[in-house]
């Protein structure tokens, strides 16, 4: 089997991080002011990327897909449950990314949002058809173009240097941290789909984490800077006013395609976990078609509740996986369902939703994960291993 290099993995996650969704989420940080907002972005990404790294390392060391690693801690039934949720999450992300990309692109060249949905969806289909291992020069050219164009966008946003919006109290620091955690957290059920194929699992996971973390922070800062220094939350409009024209179209289309490809591709891999009869590539193509149709038919302007829902599902899940694999060093769940871990996950989910009502400076995810990991350790001490599964 052809393995992927650390550089190839880095390119994949560079493309994932450069996205309109990340820039738009960055605009939400403007009420904190630049310095405080930057701190919230950095703190959130350190928390989120630490989990991102451990999730990827489990896949790299075991050679399992993301949902395959879930089966180690939750059993086959637990794997099916999270795989189904992950497919739904990724259909949602595919729709949101195509919607945001089409909306922004239509601002630059107004030929109709639905047309751009079809164009972007069509390009994602091409990316899927070529395949993750054969993208090669296509990915390198796309990433080089994105890197240059992102620098241009950064210069356009920050060249004024004078804030036009004043900080206010509409967003707490803790809520901002949680928004920063949310993006790397949303990739947790995907990263092992790529690190499992790496030549050097540790190096590939580390390079993927660092690349994604740095570039994601950069995108957040561009969005926050746009809101603070231009007073405009629509990044496409900023590019149009700056006269970027074709460059703006390239940024918007390429960034949307390279990110959404990962969503659709991993949805296909997760779908394979649901049944051996499912072909991952065909499933990814179907997800792209569904996402394109949803992007055309439904409004998707505010994704904050969607991000928090992802956090409440997948933060306790990865907390249990990290505890099982790195602390308890369990070889895998026995039986079809690890009831003990399933109960701990439910408690972790409830804890996250409760913590959402409390303003914590480090956000909800870190205390939720700490609490879930502690519960998992206690449960393993109390419940004998033979009675854990069903």
Question: Which stretches of residues belong to each language-model region?
Answer:
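Extracellular loop-to-transmembrane helix junctions
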Residues: 27-56, 78, 367, 371
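Hydrophobic alpha-helical segments and their helix-loop junctions in multi-pass secondary transporters
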Residues: 111, 128, 135, 144-170, ...
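Membrane-interface "cap" regions at the ends of multi-pass membrane proteins
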Residues: 1-36, 48, 134, 151, ...
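Membrane-interface loop-to-helix entry segments
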Residues: 115-157, 167-168, 205-212, 307-319, ...
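Hydrophobic transmembrane alpha-helices that form the core helical bundles
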Residues: 78-111, 257-273
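Transmembrane alpha-helical segments of multi-pass small-molecule transport proteins
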Residues: 12-16, 82-87, 108-130, 144-154, ...
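Juxtamembrane transmembrane-helix boundary signature
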Residues: 42-74, 81-87, 380-387
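C-terminal membrane-solvent junction of multi-pass transporters and transport-like membrane proteins
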Residues: 3, 319-390
